[in-house]
Structure formats: C-alpha cells, structure tokens
C-alpha cells in the first residue's frame, strides 16, 4: 500500500501515468493499492492510516508523507512524531514500512531544510527501515521534469520515481 501525498496520488497527471501506477505494472504478482491523497500532511495521514490499514491489510506500507508539512513550514519535530506513530501503527498491523524521504525548495532556508531531511534519515536509521532518501533523486533540480508549479513531477519523471522505490522494494517482496 502506497500511503502518500500528491506526488504519489498522481497530481496533474493523466490516469495511469503516475509512479504508483507504473509500480503496479512492474509488480503484476502483487496487489499495489494507492491510498495517497493530494495535500496530505503527516497529521492528516496519521488520522487516515488506521482505516487504510484495516481496509487494505497491507504487507508493506510505502510511507511517502511530509512534503506538505515542509511546504507549510510546520515543525519538523511534529512531523517526526507523526511519522513515528504511523510506523508503529503499521508494525502493529504486521505491515513492514518502506520510508520515502523528501527535500524542500531552498527558499525555506538551510537550517529548516536540513532539519526536515534529517527527520527521514534519522527515523529510517532508528527504526531500521528500508529507505528511499529522496523520491525525486536524480532530477530534483531539473525544472523540465516538473509541472508548471515547480513542485509536482511531470509524466517524464514518473518512471525514475518508480525505479527509485522499486530498487528498495524489490528487497522486501518475493517475486
């Protein structure tokens, strides 16, 4: 189950173009559920996760949240607490977590950006989670790979996003 925000929900893309749809195609022997929601913060995800876990009963949760927390300037400590609770909830439901990290545009300042990114790496290390440090790895500064808003990757970036996740996910699934 992919549990994320607009980057995983396929914001601004045609149906079937998003990285989660491409992941589903790459793993035909597995059921890939997209429980992502555009605009989702970690607080919103925390409130939605229990129902999603109960409904879908996933073996793996790909947790891709926090970008909207950062874009709103919310405290990284709050984001970390919410992510920690979601990891714990997932573990309680017997699901393994693959954590997906984010980065912020530089206009948020170096200190905030560093604290924001450290949430992911610290949590992955502390909880020994499989980890994709940056969903937009390899094209984060390439404006041609983003929609007009400069935040959401366009269709040309989706395979690379899928591949970043798949590289780590393959070690978690049996094919």
Describe the function of each predicted region.
Residues 1-41, 48-57:
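Serine-esterase "nucleophile elbow" of acetyl-processing enzymes
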Residues 22-26, 47-175:
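Alpha-helical cap/lid subdomain in secreted, periplasmic
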């Amino acid at each position: 189950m992919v549990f994320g925000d607009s980057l995983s929900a396929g914001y601004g893309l045609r149906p079937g173009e998003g990285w989660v749809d491409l992941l589903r195609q790459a793993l035909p022997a597995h059921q890939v559920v997209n429980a992502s929601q555009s605009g989702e913060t970690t607080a919103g995800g925390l409130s939605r996760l229990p129902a999603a876990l109960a409904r879908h009963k996933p073996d793996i949760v790909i947790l891709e949240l926090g970008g909207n927390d950062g874009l709103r300037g919310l405290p990284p400590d709050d984001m970390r607490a919410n992510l920690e609770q979601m990891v714990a909830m997932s573990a309680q439901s017997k699901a393994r977590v693959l954590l997906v990290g984010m980065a912020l545009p530089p206009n948020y300042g170096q200190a905030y950006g560093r604290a924001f990114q450290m949430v992911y790496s610290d949590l992955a290390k502390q909880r020994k989670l499989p980890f994709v440090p940056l969903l937009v790895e390899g094209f984060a500064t390439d404006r041609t790979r983003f929609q007009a808003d400069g935040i959401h990757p366009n269709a040309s970036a989706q395979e690379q996003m899928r591949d970043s996740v798949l590289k780590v996910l393959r070690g978690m699934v049996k094919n």
